[in-house]
Amino acid sequence: LGAALSFEGRSSNVRSIGEPTLEKSIKGAKDSFVETLRTNTALVRRRICTPKLKVVENAVGRKSHTNVAVMFIDGVVDPALVEETCRRLDALDVDALVSTGTFEEYIVDKSLSPFPQLLHTERPDRFAAYLLEGRVGILADGLPVGLVLPVTFAEFMRVGDDRANHFSYAAVLTLLRYLALFIALYLPALYVAVALYHQEMIPTG
């Protein structure tokens, strides 16, 4: 025939897709991200089957050359947000990307802020839902989590299964979380104030 075919037949030792360990799901999907970038992007594409889902890849790390993928939906996300995210990744000057802490330290606005500015999730369904809301997602080879930005404090009061429940039920659960946070913050201070400075308010009889 005068022709030959060549193809790669080796296998790689990678972890198979399993259930989330931190974000347990009751009614939602049971799969989670793994340490392989190609597998993670495929998990997202399975949920968002549109050509408008874009992936911009880059290599981060002077020595590690870790593949990093920026994912977003064209026409939904703010183009300025995508441009700024890619610019900060290009300016990332580190030897190796070994953990998500590198992103936290170098690409956020205020690295010393006590409040997280990136949301970590190991669930592809939650990651895809944020992309549909107009946010930018970051996946990196070797990291079994996806990063979402920008986020507000309210996002950390929601869980992945909120989208699997009816809106009214999810809203009640979110309200209870805020109530629990309020009690945890103010009830101890109120008790100390009453016990030390306003003992007359405590019934003795």
Model-derived segments and spans:
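Cytosolic regulatory modules rich in charged/polar residues
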Residues: 1-205
